[in-house]
Amino acid sequence: QSCRSKAEIDKYKWVDDEKLYKDNDFVNENHLSRHCIGLSGMKFTDAEIEDLAKRIRKMKETGTHLCCSIGFLTEHQAKILKEAGLDRINHNLNSSRSYYPNICSTHTFEQRVANIKMLQELGFEICSGGIIGMGESKEDVVDMLLELREIQPEALPINFLLPIPGTPLEHADISGLTTEYCLKVLCLARLLVPKSDI
């Protein structure tokens, strides 16, 4: 998701409407729980948010439960999306408060938490979790999960790093991500945040 990334992926501004609505139909036809739309970027203009809201209204006509991964929103922008019918927003903590500066320099951990709290106050369901394997300690994993316990997200994704060529973490050492360790992280997440979908 970084403009500095050299990963070999397709790059485009927006998915075209035909594909977006076709994907939405696929969700409904296969009785999937929700349609999650991912947008790469940290901030969007009000015009871009209005454009997204128009598409959300169209998809909500079919009763789809919609989630967006959309970066930071102003309260005004969040209200536009809420009124359009957006149900859930994904905004991951990614790591612990103390380790966060090692993985991100564009904003702070505190800004992420504040964004999530604002979204919760507006009535959005929250999807928030983290990435394991970026060089953090076991204590960092625990600290992140304790922060998530305070947030109580409806969904808590636990991602395990898969180093991708062309990204800053392409040479990350993930030898510690054994099956046993990954299962322990998932079990700890379940114990600390028992009501969230993992």
Residue spans for each PLM region:
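Short amphipathic alpha-helices and their capping/turn segments at secondary-structure boundaries
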Residues: D23-F26, T74-G85, V142-Q152
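Conserved SAM/AdoMet-binding glycine-rich loop
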Residues: N30-I116, Q120-S128, M134-E136, D197
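Charged helix-capping and loop-helix junction motifs
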Residues: K19, I49-K54, T108-E110, V141-L145, ...
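Alpha-helical scaffold segments that flank or form the walls of functional sites
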Residues: D17-H31
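Short glycine-enriched, charge-decorated loop/helix-capping segments at active-site entrances
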Residues: D10-W14, N102-H107, E170-S175
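Conserved C-terminal portion of the radical SAM core fold
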Residues: I37-L39, E61-G63, E110-P168, Y181-I198
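Canonical Radical SAM [4Fe-4S] cluster-binding loop centered on the CxxxCxxC motif
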Residues: Q1-K19
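Glycine-rich, proline-tolerant flexible connector loops at the mouths of alpha/beta enzymes
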Residues: R4, E8, C36-E48, Y99-Y100, ...
